[in-house]
């Protein structure tokens, strides 16, 4: 997986609380088990006025020209609630998002995001309100998300964020669960060599 150390990108504000995984990627698009191809259906029921996904909704933020090419999503509390589908972070990353900034996340979505190199950043509600105001005031507003320094840089302001050291290591080194296991291949082999033959 790609390493994540720092990312600068255009920010799109999704001003809605309790955005669930069915809104992120509706259930009718979950037939595949690969990680690609879901971006075209991200927020499908909000982005499009028709079921076929052919008529964009001009009022939805992702369809507005000022947010074209956005790669950082600014959201409200309890983002990613609902079912545990891993397709939700798949859809976000396939669309082009690298980070989601919100006051809080649903636990399962939060964990799934790290597994898919999507960085979920938690800031206070007051800080989130400040960021929404910044994005509204300046077209093409960009933030820099610095995972190594654990901070979001927005204009001349810096917002530190907390993250579990293990998950930070996981993303900075581009690891998934298999890659993490392979890092300990020698220790695993030594352990297995010490076990009775009938256990191997």
UniProtKB/Swiss-Prot annotation:
One of its GO terms (molecular function) is 3-isopropylmalate dehydratase activity. It comes from the Bacteria. The keyword Mitochondrion does not apply. CDD domains: IPMI_Swivel. Its EC number is 4.2.1.33. Keywords: Amino-acid biosynthesis, Branched-chain amino acid biosynthesis, Leucine biosynthesis, Lyase. InterPro entries: 3-IsopropMal_deHydase_ssu, Aconitase/3IPM_dehydase_swvl, AconitaseA/IPMdHydase_ssu_swvl, IPMI_Swivel, LeuD. It catalyses: (2R,3S)-3-isopropylmalate = (2S)-2-isopropylmalate. Gene3D superfamilies: Aconitase, domain 4. One of its GO terms (cellular component) is 3-isopropylmalate dehydratase complex. Transmembrane segments: none annotated. It is an enzyme of class 4 (lyase). Pathway: Amino-acid biosynthesis; L-leucine biosynthesis; L-leucine from 3-methyl-2-oxobutanoate: step 2/4. Belongs to the LeuD family. LeuD type 1 subfamily. Catalyzes the isomerization between 2-isopropylmalate and 3-isopropylmalate, via the formation of 2-isopropylmaleate. Heterodimer of LeuC and LeuD. This is 3-isopropylmalate dehydratase small subunit. It comes from Sodalis glossinidius (strain morsitans). The gene is leuD.
């Amino acid at each position: 997986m790609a390493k994540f150390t720092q990312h600068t990108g255009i920010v799109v504000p999704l001003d809605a609380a309790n955005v669930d995984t069915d809104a992120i990627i509706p259930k009718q698009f979950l037939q595949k088990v690969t990680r690609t191809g879901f971006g075209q259906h991200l927020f499908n029921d909000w982005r499009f006025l028709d079921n076929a996904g052919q008529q964009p909704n001009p009022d939805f933020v992702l369809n507005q020209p000022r947010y074209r090419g956005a790669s950082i999503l600014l959201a409200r509390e309890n983002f990613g609630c609902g079912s545990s589908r891993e397709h939700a972070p798949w859809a976000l990353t396939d669309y082009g998002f690298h980070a989601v900034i919100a006051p809080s996340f649903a636990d399962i979505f939060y964990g799934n995001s790290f597994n898919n190199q999507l960085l979920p950043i938690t800031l206070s509600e007051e800080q989130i309100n400040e960021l929404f105001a910044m994005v509204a005031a300046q077209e093409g507003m960009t933030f820099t998300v610095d995972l190594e320094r654990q901070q979001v840089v927005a204009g001349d302001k810096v917002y530190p964020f907390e993250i579990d050291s293990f998950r930070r290591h996981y993303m900075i080194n581009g690891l998934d669960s298999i890659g993490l296991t392979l890092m300990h291949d020698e220790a695993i082999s030594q352990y297995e060599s010490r076990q009775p033959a009938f256990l191997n």
